[in-house]
Every structure is written in structure tokens, then in C-alpha cells.
């Protein structure tokens, strides 16, 4: 990342076991809601007032472990981007890496290529001091994805589609796919945002799937948690990741490591490749840069992967084909205010959307249960109903 740690004095080495214990005790505790006066005061803060100082005042009211998904935020702390778009962006930016796996007949080599793709789905947070918008129930996000194949040719029949299928708990179902190739990656998990004292922990609670129709194979993967280091101005993945196939006994276990306060590297990880209980390979490096693989039988180390720099071209629907539930429509008022640097306007437009959603939720209590429009649950998995050719 090339950044230097900032404000390290506020984030000292702590007893992680004690933090996790407190987090478990407060996991279901609602986040305190700031009053309108509190929010306005933060937006009206004197020019030059440290954003971190304002955050420090705000989090004094929050207990460790509190779910902060729905915490009130002043306009100056709103990132004008729907969370719904993150999953699609992350999994489509380098979708070409997954299409490469569809041309690999060797089972182990195909799994290694899938793991390369999964490394590309890891991304750093744009702004650790701003919170993206929580998607409303039924909100959607879609686009056409243009990638390069192994020969440098354009492949344009790739798409992503996302829908917010649940509000309590917040669940987004996102699919990136190429129907012609029979390649599909679906990410559909409850996401928990917890305040952990000096950072925010984003957990993806469950498994996601990648399918290759050509090989009649389904991969299951578990994404590592993310730690947003508020006072050090960066984010990182810390924890475990797993990749396995339903066709064989190959398994990849990854451990993502935290950047120490002093020294160390950003975005470090180590993965081990197994066949059954036998360890075959070790992959090590930084997921944002270079990675090497070591054959544990011969102890030979060779380059494994370097993260690509050129991402996919994203083509959004034109105005005539944009759904009324699209994020660009739902949050248009917030986005417009953001372009004008009108932080109070952002707050006001956000409140308008949220108040309308509360009214709709009240009406739904007396009606049938809300059902997703674009995804159906088939064999226990949420799947996109209509795939584009």
C-alpha cells in the first residue's frame, strides 16, 4: 500500500481474546443513535477539525462488540456509495481470472487458478472514516462486464446482478456470471459490522459458491473477515479463508495476517494446499502484490501470481433500462448532494429514503412476507432467476 501508520498511539497491542469475549457479550446490543442535533454539530464542526477526533467522540458511546450496521452517521461521514455495489465490484473486477480456470482440465491446477481469482476479490477500503449506505430491501445493482481472455481478446458476455434480499439480518445476494461459458460466482451471506474498540470488524458469515458447468464442479469458499483500522487509516483482512471442491479432496486453507504497529507488511497471507491430509504446497506473499508457491516435497519456490493492474470495464444500463430499484435511483438525492459537497443535504436525502422504508416495513407487517424479486432459493442456495446470454 505504501502508506505509513498514522495515530499509532491510539491503537496499542491489546488482548485479542479479551476483546473477542467482550464482543460476544455485546453482539446483540443495538448501536446508540445520535440525535439530529449531534449529527448537525458534527457536520458544522470548525474547518480543520480532525475527522479522527470527531470519530473519537462518537465511538465513546459505543460498546465493544456492538453491531454498528445501522448506526446514525452525519453527512460528512457518509460515503456516497451503496454497500450493495461492493460485492459485485469486488467479484467482477478481475472476473477474467475465473474464466481462465474454465479452460484448465487438471483438477489441482484449476483449483489453484480459482484461488488466484479469489485473491483478486480482496480490496482495500476507499475511506476508513466514511460509511457506505446500507441497501434498502429490494435494492438492485447490475452491469455488463468486459474482460480480456488469455489471448487478449475482449469477452463481453459477462454480467453481475445484486439484490438486497433481507434487511434483518442484512443480506445481499450477488452473482457474477458468464452464461455461455457456464461460469458462475454467487456471494450471498449475512454481513456483520462490529465495533472492536480500535477497529471495525466486518464478518461474512457463511459460505459462497463458484460453479463450472463444463466440469460439473462446485467450489465452496469462506471469505476472511476485514478489519477497518480507523485510527491507522487503512483496512486489512485478518483471519481464515477456505476453498474446497465437491469433485475431489483438494483443499486450500489461507491465513491472512495483521500488519503490526511497527514493521511487517501490509496484506500478508500464507496458504497451504492439501490433498486429503497431505500438504502439497505453500503459497505466501501479499494478496495486493506478488505471491510465490513452494512445493513442499522438493522445497522448490516459484512465482505463483502477481495481482493484475488492469481491471474489467464496467458498462451500466442506460437510463431507459435502469430498474427503479437500482442503487443509482434509490440514492440519487444523496449522490447529487455529494457531488455538490453538501453534507447536510446528504443527511437529509438519506433520512428521506430511510423514513420511506420504515413506512413500507410497517405496511409489510400486515401483509404477506416480502420475497426477493430476482433471486430464488434452490437447493438451499439463492440463485439468480434470469441469466443474460
Swiss-Prot record:
GO biological process, any: culmination involved in sorocarp development
The subcellular localization recorded is: Cytoplasm
The UniProt keyword set, sorted, is: Coiled coil, Cytoplasm
The main place the protein resides is cytoplasm
Coiled coil residues, start to end: 1-31, 340-371
How is this protein annotated for GO cellular component?
cell periphery; cytosol; membrane; perinuclear region of cytoplasm
User: What Gene Ontology molecular-function terms does this entry list?
Assistant: sterol binding
Q: Which domain of life is it from?
A: Eukaryota
Q: Does the keyword Zinc-finger apply?
A: no
Q: Where is this region: Disordered?
A: 1-43
Q: Does the keyword Zinc apply?
A: no
Quaternary structure and interacting proteins, as annotated: Interacts with dstC.
What's the stated role of this polypeptide? May play a role in the regulation of the slug-fruiting body switch.
Q: So what family is this one in?
A: Belongs to the OSBP family.
Designated name of the protein: Oxysterol-binding protein 1
Question: Lineage of the source organism?
Answer: Eukaryota, Amoebozoa, Evosea, Eumycetozoa, Dictyostelia
> Gene of origin?
osbA
Amino acid at each position: 500500500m505504501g502508506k505509513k501508520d498514522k495515530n499509532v498511539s491510539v491503537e496499542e497491542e491489546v488482548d485479542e481474546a479479551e476483546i473477542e469475549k467482550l464482543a460476544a457479550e455485546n453482539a446483540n446490543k443495538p448501536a446508540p443513535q445520535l440525535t439530529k442535533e449531534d449529527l448537525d454539530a458534527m457536520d458544522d464542526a470548525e474547518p480543520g477539525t480532525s475527522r479522527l477526533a470527531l470519530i473519537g467522540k462518537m465511538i465513546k458511546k459505543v460498546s465493544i462488540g456492538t453491531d454498528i450496521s445501522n448506526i446514525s452517521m452525519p453527512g460528512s461521514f457518509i460515503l456516497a456509495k451503496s454497500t450493495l455495489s461492493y460485492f459485485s465490484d469486488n467479484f467482477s473486477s478481475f472476473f477474467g481470472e475465473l474464466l481462465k480456470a474454465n479452460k484448465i482440465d487438471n483438477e489441482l491446477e484449476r483449483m489453484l487458478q480459482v484461488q488466484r481469482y479469489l485473491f483478486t476479490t480482496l480490496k482495500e477500503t476507499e475511506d476508513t472514516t466514511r460509511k457506505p449506505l446500507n441497501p434498502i430491501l429490494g435494492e438492485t445493482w447490475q452491469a455488463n462486464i468486459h474482460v480480456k481472455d488469455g489471448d487478449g481478446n475482449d469477452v463481453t458476455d459477462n454480467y453481475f446482478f445484486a439484490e438486497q434480499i433481507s434487511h434483518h439480518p442484512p443480506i445481499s445476494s450477488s452473482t457474477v456470471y458468464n452464461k455461455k461459458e457456464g461460469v458462475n460466482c454467487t456471494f450471498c451471506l449475512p454481513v456483520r459490522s462490529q465495533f472492536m474498540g480500535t477497529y471495525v470488524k466486518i464478518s461474512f458469515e457463511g459460505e459462497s459458491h463458484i460453479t463450472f458447468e463444463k466440469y460439473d464442479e462446485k467450489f465452496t469458499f469462506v471469505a476472511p473477515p476485514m478489519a477497518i483500522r480507523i485510527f491507522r487509516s487503512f483496512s486489512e483482512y485478518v483471519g481464515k479463508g477456505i476453498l474446497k471442491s465437491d469433485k475431489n479432496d483438494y483443499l486450500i486453507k489461507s491465513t491472512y495476517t495483521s500488519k503490526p504497529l511497527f514493521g511487517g507488511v501490509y496484506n500478508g497471507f500464507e496458504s497451504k494446499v492439501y490433498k486429503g491430509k497431505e500438504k502439497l504446497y505453500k503459497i505466501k506473499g501479499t494478496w495486493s502484490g506478488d505471491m510465490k508457491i513452494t512445493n513442499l516435497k522438493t522445497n522448490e519456490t516459484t512465482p505463483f501470481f502477481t495481482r493484475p493492474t488492469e481491471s474489467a470495464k464496467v458498462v451500466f444500463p442506460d437510463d431507459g433500462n435502469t430498474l427503479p430499484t437500482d442503487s443509482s435511483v434509490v440514492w440519487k438525492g444523496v449522490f447529487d448532494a455529494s457531488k455538490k459537497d453538501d453534507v447536510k443535504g446528504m443527511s437529509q436525502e438519506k433520512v428521506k429514503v430511510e423514513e420511506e422504508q420504515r413506512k413500507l416495513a410497517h405496511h409489510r407487517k400486515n401483509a404477506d412476507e416480502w420475497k426477493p424479486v430476482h433471486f430464488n432459493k434452490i437447493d438451499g442456495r439463492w440463485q439468480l432467476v434470469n441469466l443474460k446470454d
